[in-house]
Amino acid sequence: MRRRNVSFLRPPGALPESAFLKTCIHCGQCAAACPYGSVRMLETFGPERHTPEIRPSEIPCWLCMKCPPACPSGALRPVAAMKEANMGRAVIFKDRCLNWIESGTMCMTCYDRCPLRGEGMVLDMGYVPAV
């Protein structure tokens, strides 16, 4: 059976994936430390089972940085500044974005959810999101 190539968005300060999987002890303390409920433990099979993930489309990470100090194994390392969290890059799908599809529409959902708004995500022309 061939394994699917699946990637998960890990909490801030996560080691590279292979090292993360070897280091994480599946304790859930990172998820318990998250005041927003953004960090949750994966319910899957394989080595990723009971490791932390973030699903920004459901509950975004607000980069409060409470999860790294809660990690007893070192799978999550402290992050000095939000910009160093390096949790990925947002992508704007212009064919699905109301501000791009309908002129004059003022949807701010992605901008409001971005913890680095104004830096990681900006509003071009005052209302069109850009990364």
Indicate residue ranges for each PLM-predicted region.
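Non-ligating segments of multi-cofactor redox enzymes
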Residues: 1-131
